[in-house]
Amino acid sequence: MEQIEKQIRENYHKAFYDLIEENINSEKPDLDWIIRLYEEIKERLLSFIKKNQKVRQQINEDFDVDFFKHLISNDVFDFESMTKLINSTFDWVLKLQAPIHDASTNERRKLVLNSEPKKIVQIFIKEVHLCLDQIDEDLQKLT
């Protein structure tokens, strides 16, 4: 049963990320959808922080949705700013996840940063969400 659930989850994720890729590569991409996925990253990180208001405030400051929107909707790709945003996001994941996953998270970061510019946003969204899924799985095992 566990194997079937895993296969269903993998198929769902593949279809979902294929839709993201198709959307981003379309003539008129739905940027609101991508922005919502970025906001979801922020919300998921905040959900892991229950009481520490200082950390919650730092996450809120680091995840500037308007800045992200500007980055992805601008016709001129700002690789330096995007790199900072990607690194900041993965730094938060590394702070909040179990240390056993640090190597795989850093590999995901490298994958994103080494992506070609036209694919970097979709790969970033996918890889961060996969890291957050791992944190969720770890937390479920603890309860």
Where do the model's predicted regions map?
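Eukaryotic N-terminal, low-complexity and coiled-coil-prone scaffolding/targeting segments
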Residues: 1-97
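Extended helix-rich, non-globular scaffold segments
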Residues: 58-143
